[in-house]
């Protein structure tokens, strides 16, 4: 019988990063929260799908809240205290994700909407008739 060998993968070194930037990408189908340092290197990330939600439930505000809490918890372990929040996209989880970051214990210094707006680019999808 073969012995089971426990592999220890590359562990990310714990760094002390006092302030950073939270990037929240909120679409109609999912919400992705990435917390970076000021240079743009990712400290922690989470998404509604990574938090255990599947299908249509990934687009809900509660899924966005859960994803933001998970990312904030990992960022707090790295020593983060203050963040700027950059929000992108039209999804329903935008405000909930920001509130979850604040409740988790991160001090929000700035909230900026960086949703890209086309200057008459691609044609929009046709209107849904339900």
Swiss-Prot record:
Part of the 30S ribosomal subunit. Interacts with proteins S7 and S18. Binds to IF-3. The keyword Coiled coil does not apply. Transmembrane segments: none annotated. The lineage of its organism: Bacteria, Bacillati, Cyanobacteriota, Cyanophyceae, Synechococcales. It comes from the Bacteria. Coiled coil: none annotated. It comes from Synechococcus sp. (strain WH7803). InterPro entries: Ribosomal_uS11 (IPR001971), Ribosomal_uS11_bac-type (IPR019981), Ribosomal_uS11_CS (IPR018102), Ribosomal_uS11_sf (IPR036967). Located on the platform of the 30S subunit, it bridges several disparate RNA helices of the 16S rRNA. Forms part of the Shine-Dalgarno cleft in the 70S ribosome. This is Small ribosomal subunit protein uS11. GO terms for molecular function: rRNA binding; structural constituent of ribosome. Keywords: Ribonucleoprotein, Ribosomal protein, RNA-binding, rRNA-binding. SUPFAM superfamilies: Translational machinery components (SSF53137).
